[in-house]
Amino acid sequence: MTKIKWLGAFALVFVMLLGGCSLPGLGGASDDTIKIGAQSMTESEIVANMIAQLIEHDTDLNTALVKNLGSNYVQHQAMLGGDIDISATRYSGTDLTSTLGKEAEKDPKKALNIVQNEFQKRFSYKWFDSYGFDNTYAFTVTKKFAEKEHINTVSDLKKNASQYKLGVDNAWLKRKGDGYKGFVSTYGFEFGTTYPMQIGLVYDAVKNGKMDAVLAYSTDGRIKAYDLKILKDDKRFFPPYDCSPVIPEKVLKEHPELEGVINKLIGQIDTETMQELNYEVDGKLKEPSVVAKEFLEKHHYFD
């Protein structure tokens, strides 16, 4: 895929912070080059590469990848400014509460319908159906611990919660809505001790027995690699974060072939698969472009 180019997102962020202007030469879909935005997350870069490679295989279009978009807000502003033509990964729960300013919706189908309708109405953007994975917070334990304590759901933690050590990312304890305070209100119990830490440290902490349970990201590859167990959120406390691509209707009108290409990925990547792909990058240190290509080849997208 020699036509795929990487564009430095730091310049994009700098320009937007100064005045919301588009970068020179990056405004909209021009010269048959489609600019695909990837957030600064492993799975976003993997999926962005899948989209780019499929577009270049199936069409006569070129692609450029704009990576390291540091937040959902930065990604959204980049699309509003015409600096990217495709958002590779947008999450229903995030855009529902942040971009749209609406109350969290716990039903995945309803949440998806709301963001699809509102993005069409407010921005003339097409929010596609989900790839098939949901990257949400998930209470996670070792399988050995789950068997010993007879735990399968979050509610099962309640019996001995006062004895458990919980590792969480730094921000969650103070988050409004789906943070610790809301959790206690919904589930009716507190943990004996909570330990805030960087999200990347929670997996080793629970694997090595430093923590009894941790709050993880459901698509992180270490969940599968470390043979951890995600507990069912039986009271549906966390809102859904189903992942989808988003494209302005203007771009689809200029390049109608894009919709068919994108639809090839819809519903084809479940949470377990995304865990595996993420681990190929984070655990085995493969490049996202290589992992994307291997997935597409394995599933006969290039045949």
Curated annotation (Swiss-Prot):
One of its GO terms (molecular function) is transmembrane transporter activity. GO terms for cellular component: ATP-binding cassette (ABC) transporter complex. It is a lipid-anchor. Belongs to the OsmX family. Induction: Repressed by OpcR. The lineage of its organism: Bacteria, Bacillati, Bacillota, Bacilli, Bacillales. Transmembrane segments: none annotated. The complex is composed of two ATP-binding proteins (OpuCA), two transmembrane proteins (OpuCB and OpuCD) and a solute-binding protein (OpuCC). This is Glycine betaine/carnitine/choline-binding protein OpuCC. GO terms for biological process: amino acid transport. Member of a high affinity multicomponent binding-protein-dependent transport system for glycine betaine, carnitine, and choline. A lipid is attached at residue 21 (N-palmitoyl cysteine). A lipid is attached at residue 21 (S-diacylglycerol cysteine). It is found in: Cell membrane. Keywords: Amino-acid transport, Cell membrane, Lipoprotein, Membrane, Palmitate, Signal, Transport. Its main location: membrane. PROSITE patterns: PROKAR_LIPOPROTEIN (PS51257).
